[in-house]
Every structure is written in C-alpha cells, then in structure tokens.
Amino acid sequence: FFSMIPKIATGIASLVKDL
C-alpha cells in the first residue's frame, strides 16, 4: 500500500498544477 503513495501523490500534484 505504502509503495503506491508516491505514485498517488505525484498524480495529485500534477492535477493541482493543471488547475
């Protein structure tokens, strides 16, 4: 589970940049 956190965090960060 914790190994997926970096990928999710990166995905959220990229979405925030688009806003």
Swiss-Prot record:
Keyword flag Zinc: no
Tissue: Expressed by the skin glands.
Superkingdom to which the source organism belongs: Eukaryota
Residues that bear Leucine amide: 19
Signal peptide: none
GO cellular component terms, semicolon-separated: extracellular region
Annotated keywords: Amidation, Amphibian defense peptide, Antimicrobial, Cytolysis, Fungicide, Hemolysis, Immunity, Innate immunity, Secreted
Example GO biological process: killing of cells of another organism
Subcellular location: Secreted
Primary localization class, coarse: secreted
Assigned protein family: Belongs to the frog skin active peptide (FSAP) family. Phylloseptin subfamily.
Function: Antimicrobial peptide with weak activity against fungus C.albicans ATCC 24433 (MIC=100 uM). Not active against Gram-negative bacterium E.coli ATCC 25922 and Gram-positive bacterium S.epidermidis ATCC 12228 at concentrations up to 100 uM. Has an anti-inflammatory effect, since it inhibits the production of the pro-inflammatory cytokines TNF-alpha, and induces the production of the anti-inflammatory cytokine IL-10. Has high activity of stimulation of insulin release, which may protect the species from being eaten by predators by causing fatal hypoglycemia. Is cytotoxic to cancer line cells.
UniProt-recorded name of the protein: Phylloseptin-3.2TR
Organism field: Phyllomedusa trinitatis (Trinidad leaf frog)
